[in-house]
């Protein structure tokens, strides 16, 4: 979340920067809340000082043998008033904090202003889309013909936007995840991590899914007096980043680099009618996530590095893609700067998102109280957090099926995956 102090001292400038990403900050309401907070703060401090002074006089009066019953009653009355003001102040601070928790991150100055994805900037492009001398099929037709993608069974078992994979396509899907993890751990310096698929509310608050995006989650257990509710993770970013929640990291341990392959679960609220065909938008999907925890001065360079790590997967698989710098109006809630990787899908004759790599700066760290000890003054300071897909496994499978298809409907296995496929070079 944004620094509440910054909201108070730089309210107009903050509102202007947030407006560039289509968010209207109610400055009048916040100003009113701040004035009330100041007033309550003064009243609370004055009542506290008065009670302390009078309490001190009780001991002096007792030493003189005086009756202190009237003073005791006065202290009790002041205590009641003080408790009431403290409760009022706490309620107000909660309201201010809720606004801060529901306000998106400030865009970095290097992010182009724009209203939506049409104003994103292409940074670079790799590979040349293949020219086919036969009619191109989409991944759904290819996968069903091969007997590897079974949507009908998934609908029967669960419902729409789920998949059953079989045989060599299931193996290819597994091979992709293994290849990605090996690349990131052996060449890019990430620590492979196994994490829970269920997380509590504090974790979702820490990474920014709550309170604003609760409808996008699959909630499995409601909150009770015994404990917090549990929800399925929408991305491994949540458990990986929360590894440093309420922690002071030694500067010598930075950067921290985590990767995990997990199933991810999203309700896709608001996406009705979009990408209803095939694997592009599923309620359950596999993803290899990359997370970096770094010092503030290192985070922008870390974003470039993390993005290149995700790009390397596409390059080794021989999949054409382009790298897009998102404009202010298209960035995610917690991001300060984001690159999207878009892979070429010949059946759609367009590039589609396959990875999103973001620098959150201290937005998540402030929520999580994730800190490191600054060597300059030996005091705890907020870390910066970054995350990205390296990659979405299902969408990578889609890209391979479409880009490596042959005229007879078979699929050529990319060279880098042969060892993960037991030497299989052709599916079909």
Curated annotation (Swiss-Prot):
Pathway(s) where this gene product acts: Aminoacyl-tRNA biosynthesis; selenocysteinyl-tRNA(Sec) biosynthesis; L-seryl-tRNA(Sec) from L-serine and tRNA(Sec): step 1/1
| Alphabetical GO biological process terms | selenocysteine biosynthetic process; seryl-tRNA aminoacylation
**Primary localization:** cytoplasm
Keywords associated with the record: Aminoacyl-tRNA synthetase, ATP-binding, Cytoplasm, Ligase, Nucleotide-binding, Protein biosynthesis
Span-the-membrane segments of this chain are none
Q: Which GO terms describe its cellular component?
A: cytoplasm
Gene3D superfamilies associated with the record: Bira Bifunctional Protein, Domain 2 (3.30.930.10), Serine-tRNA synthetase, tRNA binding domain (1.10.287.40)
Enzyme group, top EC level? ligase
The places in or outside the cell where this protein is found are:
Cytoplasm
Q: What is its EC number?
A: 6.1.1.11
**Residues annotated to bind ATP:** 266-268, 353-356
Give me the reactions it catalyses: tRNA(Ser) + L-serine + ATP = L-seryl-tRNA(Ser) + AMP + diphosphate + H(+); tRNA(Sec) + L-serine + ATP = L-seryl-tRNA(Sec) + AMP + diphosphate + H(+)
Query: Any idea which positions bind L-serine?
Result: 235-237, 289, 389
Give one GO term, molecular function aspect: serine-tRNA ligase activity
Pfam families for this protein: Seryl_tRNA_N, tRNA-synt_2b
InterPro entries from the entry?
Answer: aa-tRNA-synt_IIb, aa-tRNA-synth_II, aa-tRNA-synth_II/BPL/LPL, Ser-tRNA-ligase_type_1, Ser-tRNA-synth_1_N, SerRS_1_N_sf, SerRS_core, tRNA-bd_arm
Kindly give the SUPFAM superfamilies that the UniProt entry links to this protein: Class II aaRS and biotin synthetases, tRNA-binding arm
Quaternary structure (record): Homodimer. The tRNA molecule binds across the dimer.
Q: What does this protein do?
A: Catalyzes the attachment of serine to tRNA(Ser). Is also able to aminoacylate tRNA(Sec) with serine, to form the misacylated tRNA L-seryl-tRNA(Sec), which will be further converted into selenocysteinyl-tRNA(Sec).
Family, per entry: Belongs to the class-II aminoacyl-tRNA synthetase family. Type-1 seryl-tRNA synthetase subfamily.
Domain comment as written in the entry: Consists of two distinct domains, a catalytic core and a N-terminal extension that is involved in tRNA binding.
PANTHER family in the record: SERINE--TRNA LIGASE, SERYL-TRNA SYNTHETASE
Report what the protein is called.
Serine--tRNA ligase
Q: Which gene encodes it?
A: serS
